[in-house]
């Protein structure tokens, strides 16, 4: 993703004549090689964009500047609004990026074709090897950093299915194992792509349905486009069936909110849920060589989401997204209604507990033999805490209880006035129980 990257601007100029030479002294002879660009040095954390990604379920992203045949380095950071970049950044230089596309910052004429881009990349590798062997008497900043970054994850934004094969072939020639980003049409060359054994990054930007209500416009729709529109949701299923290792990305989507919708559609079309989960968690973590994200285990970052149901079902919604231990509420959960009258037991002592008020703003009253106790209640479904003030008005002491709501009761642990820890429970009184108590009270009154 290009999230949070402050893009450098091209210098203004009105020259219409072709530019053949580099504009940068001390760098590689071709300005479309931007190996010296470091994403971490050009950051502009965008809270609005971060919120959109969190709502889709993301907590950690790999950001880079997708500009140039060598686009520089990317960083790994979290979508954590509450802290600074110093805390958000997990790795400031995690990857080196390549594409077949020219840089928008340069007007240099070469390369002007896909074939030219491939030739330039090959020339770069040869020049880098020559430079590393001490072949140059002068310093070349681009070749210097390109060689330094060879130990990083090498990500090639290839795009089209055929370009995946082209990128892999370049990698084979120079002994580079690229992680290759595709375009979502990999199923059309699945046999060749499978043989590459490359790890892919796959977008799920399914094409919109064509409007064929106008007969004239309908005739302009190409059959191959219609066929791809029909087959696109099967792409992830086909990749999984052929044991292609891949992660998923929001790249190429007009709106990040379409990510979950399209992913659920892919699952509906046969993409296994366990494969989908791995493509969102463990596989991206392995691509980034990070062992403290992607799984929930002791020592890992507290990054996880809370969902109302199965994440891959359309009726489910993301309710919370926790990032580096910070809670982000996506959809406010309506707390369950625990109002009513309870029989409260603390250790072996019985009390009457009444929970009243509005849902989300409850109040509690506790009494014993008609003696009322000062009570403060906090309820954060399913957790409940109660502070009960002692009957002694001179030497005030407290009983502190906390616990969970279950289907049948409220229960947990209590700290008594003397510091002793005991169990407690509160069982909701039925209407029948209340009636019986009233009858007993009436008889006593008679």
Annotated model-derived regions:
Residues 333-352, 361-370, 375-377, 410-417, ...:
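Tryptophan-anchored aromatic micro-motifs
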Residues 301-334:
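C-terminal cap of metal-dependent C-N hydrolases
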Residues 17-21, 422-446:
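N-terminal pre-domain segments of enzymes
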Residues 369-408:
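Contiguous, well-ordered beta-strand patches that form the walls/edges
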